[in-house]
Amino acid sequence: MARIGDGGDLLKCSFCGKSQKQVKKLIAGPGVYICDECIDLCNEIIEEELAESSEVKLDELPKPAEIRDFLENYVIGQDAAKRTLAVAVYNHYKRIQAGDKGRDARGETVELAKSNILMLGPTGCGKTYLAQTLAKMLNVPFAIADATALTEAGYVGEDVENILLKLIQAADYDVKRAETGIIYIDEVDKIARKSENPSITRDVSGEGVQQALLKILEGTQASVPPQGGRKHPHQEFIQIDTTNVLFIVAGAFAGLERIVSDRVGKRGIGFGAEVRSKAEIDTQDHFAEVMPEDLIKFGLIPEFIGRLPVVASVTNLDKESLVQILSEPKNALVKQYNRLFDMDGVELEFTTDALEAIADQAILRGTGARGLRAIMEEVLLPVMYDIPSRDDVEKVVVSAETVNDNVLPTIVPRKPERGERRDKSA
């Protein structure tokens, strides 16, 4: 560690052997020394290893069928959307592994374009949850943004770059890892322009936001304020490349079904046409038949639609699907509440009729799967308030009457132990 020469004691780095005169800084530990150059080298090695571990490797990338099977464990129904998402996500990360370029059979270089995803469907049908589950499976950073909070640069509201800040924060400010993450932009139907025809007045929260999103959707080197908010010239920025960020853009698109219905209904003209009633047209899955022209009529600009080539649609959940959502997935609501009651030493049971009644309530309210938890909270609130203070409850049974008629759940008392019986008889 230390060498004694003509000039007295000369300290050396325990790792590279350089003396304190050959390096800028020498840091002492218990019996060891390390120089600034070795510290820099260690940091570089750690960063490289972390970057390698955070990348989605092609040989480890799950196949589309495996992605769909994983989604099946958490999301009930929506099979068409699962297949579409599985293929799109697989191809996206395969493209990243190829470095945006691949070679065809003749050995020529082919540029692989990015395919962002547009998800259509009513609220409470699993759009957000599908995207969250995908990110969880792939172990990539995931951020959710609300399109309604965005405005064009220079106006009151959030800049589109703040979406990227959420992704960087989700990656613990590891920009390299964030550059292969997933961003989910919800309520995108709310930024549709107010009319199909371009307006002379500025639409800062509609068409203006769509225009602002174009660059980051396609892929650009964006400057992100580290603390969020508006940009100003005297602040530092985080630079992030969005070329390999997967964007999943979603919305309920209320009213789009009428546009599709009008277009589909026009086919029923002429002697050889299939004649369908208005009721028959209304009951079919309109979102599965959406064309770019329908989205343009709704209010999305053609350039925005062009950057969302993959379209996945989700459908309204029926009663059977909602009952399955309550009890079957790995983190089903019934399992969650069972665990909460179990922590108080109480068993919780839902009858089949009770689950069906909860599903009926969700359909009646029009909230889909998102409203199931609120109904469960209302039903269980009285017993969740009372039971922690009691030690004489063995079991709580929730029936259809509890859900429909506000009847308290049935409480099964705990059987006293033998010792307790003797004490009472004495």
Swiss-Prot record:
Indicate whether Glycoprotein appears among the record's keywords: no
SMART domains associated with the record: AAA, ClpB_D2-small, zf-C4_ClpX
UniProt keywords (A-Z) are: ATP-binding, Chaperone, Metal-binding, Nucleotide-binding, Zinc
Instruction: Please indicate which superkingdom the organism of origin belongs to.
Output: Bacteria
GO biological-process terms attached to the record:
cell division; proteolysis involved in protein catabolic process
Q: List the disulfide bonds.
A: none
Residues that coordinate or bind Zn(2+): C13, C16, C35, C38
Question: Domain ClpX-type ZB spans what residues?
Answer: 1-54
Q: Which residues bind ATP per the record? A: P122, T123, G124, C125, G126, K127, T128, Y129
ATP-binding as a keyword? yes
InterPro entries referenced in this protein's UniProt entry, alphabetically = AAA+_ATPase, ATP-dep_Clp_protease_ClpX, ATPase_AAA_core, Clp_ATPase_C, Clp_protease_ATP-bd_su_ClpX, ClpX_bact, P-loop_NTPase, Znf_CppX_C4
Pfam families the UniProt entry points to: AAA_2, ClpB_D2-small, zf-C4_ClpX
Q: Name one GO molecular function term.
A: zinc ion binding
Similarity comment text for this entry: Belongs to the ClpX chaperone family.
Assembly description:
Component of the ClpX-ClpP complex. Forms a hexameric ring that, in the presence of ATP, binds to fourteen ClpP subunits assembled into a disk-like structure with a central cavity, resembling the structure of eukaryotic proteasomes.
Spell out the protein name for this chain. Answer: ATP-dependent Clp protease ATP-binding subunit ClpX
What is the primary gene name for this protein? clpX
